[in-house]
């Protein structure tokens, strides 16, 4: 759906599969030419595509007038979900999310792996990266800096870097060619309150998940998400708190 700056609706587009299929959009990005990119998933086959498995990743490009330019559907024989999308200065598109299988000949590390896929502006796939542990990982946000390095945030239940326990937030940096530059993993520890049945406090692991990432003009990286604990000396005020973490360009 598009509105102009005066809040007047310009157009509405609806992407439909078969009567028995389920489609969902999760991510949205706009390039320098005002083309629009939507990432999500489907359990059917769209635009003549055949479903690879249970759920497939979707990437759709529209022009500024709302005309569909192309649609890409891809996945493994299992569940694959596109959750975020962004565009670099050259019009290349990056999609992240998670897969329960292996994409483009890659092997799944465990339950769920993070993926990062790059397409050019014409919709031709350039490369696929897949990363995981024997447990669970998800990619929830993707950003691109002025040098076209790519940053992915999400979470892991395993050890990609230093493991704090439970679900840890992560941020990954890839260069333009898809080579991973570094991984940062961080989390908190939370405490269970005393109960009427057990008067001793118990330490438990915290669920910490990165959901969004952005880069400023100096190359600093900002990650936001939620935590059940207290990060870097902060005190948790309830069940889930918002966090904001800044990294330098490294």
Residue ranges of model-derived segments:
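A sequence-level/structural motif corresponding to short, flexible coil/turn segments enriched
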Residues: 1-250
């Amino acid at each position: 759906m598009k509105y102009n700056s005066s809040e007047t609706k310009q157009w509405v587009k609806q992407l439909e599969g078969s009567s028995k299929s389920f489609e969902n959009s999760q991510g949205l990005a706009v390039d320098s030419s005002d083309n629009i990119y939507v990432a999500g998933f489907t359990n059917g086959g769209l635009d003549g595509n055949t479903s690879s498995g249970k759920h497939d990743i979707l990437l759709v490009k529209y022009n500024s007038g709302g005309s569909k330019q192309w649609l890409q559907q891809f996945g493994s024989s299992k569940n694959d979900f596109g959750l975020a999308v962004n565009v670099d200065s050259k019009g290349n598109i990056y999609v992240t999310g998670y897969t329960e299988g292996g994409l483009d000949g890659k092997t799944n590390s465990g339950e769920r792996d993070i993926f990062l896929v790059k397409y050019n502006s014409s919709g031709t796939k350039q490369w696929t990266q897949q990363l995981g542990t024997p447990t669970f990982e998800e990619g929830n946000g993707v950003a691109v800096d002025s040098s076209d390095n790519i940053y992915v945030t999400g979470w892991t239940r395993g050890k990609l870097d230093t493991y704090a326990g439970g679900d840890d937030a992560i941020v990954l940096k890839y260069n333009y060619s898809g080579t991973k530059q570094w991984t940062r993993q961080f989390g908190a520890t939370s405490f269970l309150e005393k109960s009427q049945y057990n008067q001793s406090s118990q330490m438990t692991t915290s669920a910490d998940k990165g959901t969004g990432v952005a880069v400023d003009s100096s190359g600093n990286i900002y990650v936001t998400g939620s935590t059940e604990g207290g990060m870097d000396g902060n005190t948790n005020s309830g069940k889930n708190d918002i966090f904001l973490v800044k990294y330098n360009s490294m």
